[in-house]
Amino acid sequence: MTVKEELTSSEIANLWTAYIDNSAMSIKLKYVLHIMEDTEILPIVQKTNQLSENNLIQFNQIFDKEKYSAPIGFTDSDVHLAAPRLYSDSFFLVFLQNKMDMNLNAYSMGLSHSTRSDIRNFFQQSLAASIEIFKEATDLMLEKGIYVRPPYIPTPKTVDMTERQNFLTGWLGKRRPLTAIEIDQLFFNISRNALGHALLLGYSQVAKLKEVREHMRRGADIAKKHIHLFSSILLEEDIPAPMLWASKIEDTSVSPFSDKLLMFEVTGTTQAGVGYYGRSLASAQRRDLGAQYLKVLTDSILYGEDGGNITIKNAWLEEPPQAINFRKKVKG
C-alpha cells in the first residue's frame, strides 16, 4: 500500500508565496504587453509572461490534487489596460531583469526546502526558466547600453592574510580601502534602490488612495536616502556609483494597477530589500559599514510594517497558511 506523501509546511509556504507572486506578475505583464513598443524587449516580456502563466497552471494542478484551496491572488480587476504609459520600455526591461534576480533567490530556496520530488522538479524548472530570462534581459541591457557594470578594481597578483585588527576599523583610526565584497554589496544595493526609487515615484503619481500615495512617496524618499548613503561611501574612495532612473517616468496620474497590486509589489520589494541588507550586513567587515547597514535595515523594517498595516486596513492581505492553534482549541 502506497502512503500519500503530504505537503510539508515548507512546501506549502513556498508554493503559496510563489502562487501570489506569479499571479501579480501575470496581471502586471498584461499591461506591459499592451503598451510595449520595443520589438527587442517584447520577446523577453512574452517569455516572462509565459513562465508566470505556466506556473499558475501547475500551482492549480498541485492544489487540486492536494484538495488545497488556492490563494485568491490577483485578477483582471487589478489592471487597467487603457491606462497611459507610466514607464519607458527600457525601464520595464531593467525591472524584469531585477525580478528574475529575485526569482533566483525565491525558487532556489523553494527547491532546497522541498522534500517531494514533484515539488522539487517544479522549482527546478522555474529556476532554470528564470535563469534563461535573466541572461537574455542582461544581454539586451548590455546591447542597449543601459546595463551599469560594477566598478573595476585592480586584479590581485598575490594572496595576503590579514594580521592586524585594524582591518575591522571603521570609525576611528585609519580605515582600510573597501574590499571587493563590500563594493559589490554597496553597488547592487544602490542599483536596486535606484530602480525602487523610480518605481515608487511612478506609483506615488497614480495611486488612488491618499495614504497609498503618501506611502509610495515616503518609500521613494527612503530609497533616495539610502542611495546617497551608499554612494557617498563609494565616492569617498573615488569609486563610481550608479545613477537614478527618475527620467524614465512618464507624466500621468492614471494608474494601470489597483492600489492592492501596488501595495503588494512594494511590500514584497521591501521584504526582499531587508533580506539583501541582512546579507550585506553579514559580509561587511568594516565596523562603520555594519553600523550603516543596521540603520537602513531599521528604516526598511519600519517602512514595511507600515505598508503591512495599510494592506490589512484595506482588506488586501491574504493570510498565509498557519499551524493549528492548539491553545485556542483547548480553551474552546
Indicate residue ranges for each PLM-predicted region.
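Generic structural signal for well-ordered, non-transmembrane alpha-helical segments
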Residues: S23, Q46-E53, I57, N98-D101, ...
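An N-terminus-focused feature that recognizes amino-terminal "leader" regions
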Residues: M1-E5, S10-A13, I27, H34-F91
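Acidic, low-complexity, intrinsically disordered peripheral segments
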Residues: T311-G332
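Alpha-helical scaffold segments that form or flank carboxylate-/histidine-based iron centers
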Residues: S10-L15, T39-L51, F92, S117-I131, ...
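Hydrophobic, ordered structural segments
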Residues: I35, F95-K157
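Conserved alpha-helical segments that form or flank metal/cofactor-binding pockets of metalloenzymes
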Residues: T39-G73, I131-R149, E211-E214, R218-P242, ...
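Acidic/histidine-rich alpha-helical segments that form the ligand environment
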Residues: A13-L33, A83-F122, P177-Q205, V254-K295
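Acidic/His metal-coordination segments adjacent to aromatic residues that form catalytic metal sites
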Residues: M1-A13, I72-L96, V159-Q185, L244-T267, ...
